[in-house]
């Protein structure tokens, strides 16, 4: 499975994240409000984001999200933890968007593109979300994510441990879910 495809929608282009994207992506990430509810709420700080960016490049699977109208990078997301066993699964996450693109359908289109690609190869897509990140949890529910009873683990952040929950979207849920119907 290609974890760094080029995906194009009506308003968005998703393409592999490259080292040359640093300045444009950090311009988005340097807004503290982007990370306000995120467990790693200090990610707007340059040294913290540099480590995050380097990890994204090293791990592979990271995508730059581009507004087709302006040509600007407006965020990023990743496909990680591909497991072909048992029908296959992959995790989509590490997503953030410029505040100018909150609430207007950008996340919906981005996730629809990523899910349509991933679900050609796997039966299930998982999303680990910070337990207290209510903005991301609401966004998951809007796109048809189902909260599972699987433990999302604890991630160590600058402010201490942060518990995560796991949402999932299966191939069948996606085919008949809100991303297909409106």
Q: Model segments located where?
A:
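GNAT-family acyltransferases
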Residues: 1-104, 117-119, 124-125, 131-134, ...
């Amino acid at each position: 499975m290609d974890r760094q495809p080029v995906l194009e929608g009506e308003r968005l282009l998703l393409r592999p994240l490259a080292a040359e994207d640093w300045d444009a992506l950090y311009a988005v990430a340097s807004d503290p409000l982007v990370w306000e509810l995120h467990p790693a709420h200090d990610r707007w700080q340059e040294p913290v984001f540099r480590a995050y960016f380097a990890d994204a490049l090293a791990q592979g699977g990271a995508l730059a999200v581009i507004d087709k109208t302006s040509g600007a990078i407006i965020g990023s997301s990743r496909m990680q933890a591909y497991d072909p066993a048992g029908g296959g699964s992959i995790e989509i996450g590490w997503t953030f968007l410029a505040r100018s693109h909150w609430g207007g359908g950008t996340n919906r289109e981005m996730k629809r593109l990523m899910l349509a690609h991933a679900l050609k190869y796997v039966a299930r897509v998982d999303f680990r979300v910070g337990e207290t990140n209510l903005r991301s949890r609401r966004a998951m529910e809007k796109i048809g994510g189902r909260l599972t009873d699987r433990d999302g683990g604890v991630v160590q952040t600058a402010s201490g441990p942060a518990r995560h929950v796991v949402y999932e979207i299966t191939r069948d849920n996606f085919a008949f879910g809100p991303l297909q119907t409106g």
